[in-house]
């Protein structure tokens, strides 16, 4: 962050980032946010979404900013982590209606029993259907991860 801030100070540009680490030993999720939209954690057994919120300025804004790590413990098999750019919920159809976070969550909910790859494809297919070829103003980027049944000891997963 210090180097980036020095490089971009005069330009007014910045970069967002989310760093997420899943610790297999205790099934905990650790994250740091730097201005990026919060990731979502979906618990299908409780049918509950939660945003992985936390403070964090975009990278390059303040070279002295100290980022905080946040932790969530006790993730279970089937929990889904989705992190994307705001271009997903801001995707618009020809009438300029936004796709929305609610619709995004509903597609995840309806496909929660599938693999992470299949959930990702379902979201992109639904966005494509919704937008009907309308030109988008922002990038649409998504990563989906799903906690497995039988996690073996090993290195942490980093998203």
Model-based region annotation:
Residues 1-159:
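Conserved subregion of the PPM/PP2C metallophosphatase catalytic domain
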């Amino acid at each position: 962050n210090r180097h980036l801030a020095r490089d971009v100070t005069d330009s007014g540009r910045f970069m967002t980032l989310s760093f997420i680490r899943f610790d297999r030993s205790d099934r905990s999720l650790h994250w740091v946010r730097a201005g990026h939209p919060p990731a979502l954690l979906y618990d299908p057994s409780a049918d509950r979404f939660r945003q992985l919120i936390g403070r964090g300025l975009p990278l390059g804004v303040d070279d002295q900013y100290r980022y905080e790590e946040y932790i969530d413990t006790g993730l279970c098999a089937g929990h889904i982590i989705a992190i994307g750019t705001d271009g997903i919920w801001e995707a618009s159809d020809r009438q300029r209606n936004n796709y929305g976070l609610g619709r995004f969550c509903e597609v995840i909910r309806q496909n929660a029993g599938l693999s992470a790859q299949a959930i990702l494809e379902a979201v992109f297919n639904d966005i494509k259907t919704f937008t009907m070829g309308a030109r988008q103003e922002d990038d649409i980027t998504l990563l989906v991860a799903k906690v497995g049944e039988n996690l073996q000891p090993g290195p942490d997963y980093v998203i």
